[in-house]
């Protein structure tokens, strides 16, 4: 459980962010409005124009979560073919068959595709709109990130900036989703 600060990065964003704050408050969320000075004092962020802070937010370490899911399912019998490149997939009536780039065949009732962007070339149905997002992660420095604590940060820019600490003392900064181009 984390708190989340959504702050105005431009003066013109303050009025609609205050409306967002009121809507969240009316919906029963535990939110407070912070003035720029309060944000600066609590988090060391400069040049904000105020923001809403919520006590009800979460974040997930995607890599750790994915590995925990794999471990859980492997214990239940899931066969994992890590670092196996798929050349093709044929769907038969009672099973599916994967042909690998090494010309091995894998037969299974069900296939879980954990392949990211390559899914577009292997799955015929057009069910995915791929996005690219940008992120950087600092070196481990628990002292430098302790002021940010357990807070998620979002600004009102377009593209937005997202910031949070990681469990191992890094600062992750990301944002700027855009349509994927190969």
What is the predicted role of each segment?
Residues 10, 58-59, 126:
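Hydrophobic alpha-helical scaffolding
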